[in-house]
């Protein structure tokens, strides 16, 4: 359901808050490493719902309905997706939408990536595009959802407002997502949040949370003091005042609305799109979103309030008591970052507070220049460089031999589920008839040596055959690794040395700088598309560690992970959408030297412990090296 007002409608989380006893469309989604919820296909969602009806605490084998998802299993009890060949776990959620929305009609909107493949939009974006399409809007601005893209329906294209690059998009019909009727458990009600765990500690979330708490307290105080009186309907807002091209040189003040109806954030107009100007009846141009919808807030906050922004000089002082909110991209050619400006501005304006948006400091990505004579080896770490060449294909290891090496045969298995095929251990494997293997009988059951978890031998053979086939095995239940796990990282070079500068939070220590360099090349047999070219964007990549005992320990383990080809892999970039490119492989690095504005820098008190845990999950630890 969309918010009222003219022009492009933008939903909040796909829906508002419908009654609990109406029909809803169910969409299952998984959380990627950039904290974006990505929808499973309708076919997969139907499969998950069918399993859910039979056993709400069971597991879902996604490979049974989608051959590309063979390594993946969803644990319905913990609400996590587990990748069997790498051990990667990601939160999943069960989201709900109106049956008349895009997923209820089986409509999918997709954009074309650099490799010519079509990638589906996130579900909230898909619904937003479909709403605008049904209302016959000629264009749509996605800035309110945090994306700097314009959608043009006449040319069926998407344009990046900053780079002006265009991509094709398409609308196709697919299977409608499953429909459900009945009450929704509290853990799955609108709007479905992120995974239940530790709250996010990034600067933006801390700012929003503190702002929300402050505004709620002030608003409660105002409500206690203010007399109750009937609210008069707000007058239609006048058009925004003209601003000089390129935007104000300094800060931007957003004054509180005269009513509690809502607030809008106006910024300097940017260069308009190349498409024809919108006809009468389309919403007025918002300077923060060229040729697009006004930046929305939440619920009915889509209309601009009576307030206007006032540009002030960069040297003008901020009035006492007005909080300064750092905003990214607040410059002459870029918009106010909608995720930050919209959220905090609405919270403060709704509470009757003025808001001053200031320029955010730029991240310090690199240290000051360092001469060659100042670069020193890292104490206790031999050498300054490691190179990896093309994978030397070892003599092919028979999958049955690998599985039998780590398994002990169980003559009388318990009447429990095999968590790979979800059949009972006392019956034949679910891969009987799917995997042809004469040497392994489908009813054979084995127990892994260290952890003791039991599976059908045929199921483990199938799991191993779908992985990297490097002679190692990973328990799907506890993720214990048997053997030495290796990855699919392409050839490259890793350098490491000391530089005479300190990281924030480590004032008394020098810094370990790691430089990764991987050139463009051709994919090998272990990669997604053998024989096809892969790209390597952003290399050389510079990463930083403190030169203390724990930092050097992390470096030694990163060297081991590099030699086992676990640092990078070839896949699809979640930031650019480019396929067949080199991407990070679940081991986080700090690439911001002198600040932590992007979340990839220092200070970060928990980073070293977190990366040690990530390395352990990949089978790289000092204990495993000694074993």
Curated annotation (Swiss-Prot):
* Domain WWE positions: 14-94, 95-171
Post-translational modification (record) = Ubiquitinated; undergoes 'Lys-29'-linked polyubiquitination catalyzed by ITCH.
**Localization in the cell:** Cytoplasm; Nucleus
Q: Which InterPro entries match?
A: Deltex_C, Deltex_C_sf, Deltex_fam, WWE-dom_subgr, WWE_dom, WWE_dom_sf, Znf_RING, Znf_RING/FYVE/PHD
- Biased composition, class Polar residues, residue ranges: 296-314
Query: In its keyword annotation, does this UniProt entry include Nucleus?
Result: yes
| Annotated EC | 2.3.2.27
Q: Which UniProt keywords apply?
A: Cytoplasm, Metal-binding, Notch signaling pathway, Nucleus, Repeat, SH3-binding, Transferase, Ubl conjugation, Zinc, Zinc-finger
Q: Where is the composition biased (Basic residues)?
A: 386-396
* UniProt entry tagged with the keyword Zinc: yes
Q: Where is this motif: SH3-binding?
A: 240-243
Q: State a GO cellular component annotated for this protein.
A: nuclear body
Q: Which PROSITE patterns match?
A: WWE (PS50918), ZF_RING_2 (PS50089)
Q: GO MF annotations for this entry?
A: Notch binding; SH3 domain binding; transferase activity; ubiquitin protein ligase binding; zinc ion binding
Q: In which tissues is it expressed?
A: Predominantly expressed in the brain and testis. Weakly expressed in the thymus, spleen and ovary. Predominantly expressed in regions containing post-mitotic differentiating neurons.
Compositional bias (Pro residues) spans? Answer: 230-248, 275-287
Per the record, the pathway is: Protein modification; protein ubiquitination
Q: Where are the zinc fingers (RING-type)?
A: 418-479
User: Biological process GO annotation list?
Assistant: cellular response to leukemia inhibitory factor; glial cell differentiation; negative regulation of neuron differentiation; negative regulation of T cell differentiation; Notch signaling pathway; protein ubiquitination; regulation of Notch signaling pathway; T cell differentiation
The reaction(s) catalysed by this protein are: S-ubiquitinyl-[E2 ubiquitin-conjugating enzyme]-L-cysteine + [acceptor protein]-L-lysine = [E2 ubiquitin-conjugating enzyme]-L-cysteine + N(6)-ubiquitinyl-[acceptor protein]-L-lysine
Q: What does this protein do?
A: Regulator of Notch signaling, a signaling pathway involved in cell-cell communications that regulates a broad spectrum of cell-fate determinations. Mainly acts as a positive regulator of Notch, but it also acts as a negative regulator, depending on the developmental and cell context. Mediates the antineural activity of Notch, possibly by inhibiting the transcriptional activation mediated by MATCH1. Involved in neurogenesis, lymphogenesis and myogenesis, and may also be involved in MZB (Marginal zone B) cell differentiation.
* Record text on subunit structure and interactions: Homodimer. May form a heterodimer with other members of the Deltex family. Interacts with NOTCH1 via its N-terminal region and EIF3F, the interaction is required for NOTCH1 deubiquitination. Interacts with EP300. Forms a heterodimer with BBAP; the heterodimerization leading to an increase of in vitro ubiquitin ligase activity. Interacts with ITCH.
The UniProt comment on domains reads:
The WWE domains are thought to mediate some protein-protein interaction, and are frequently found in ubiquitin ligases.
Q: What is the name listed in the Swiss-Prot or TrEMBL entry for this protein?
A: E3 ubiquitin-protein ligase DTX1
Its taxonomic placement starts with: Eukaryota, Metazoa, Chordata, Craniata, Vertebrata
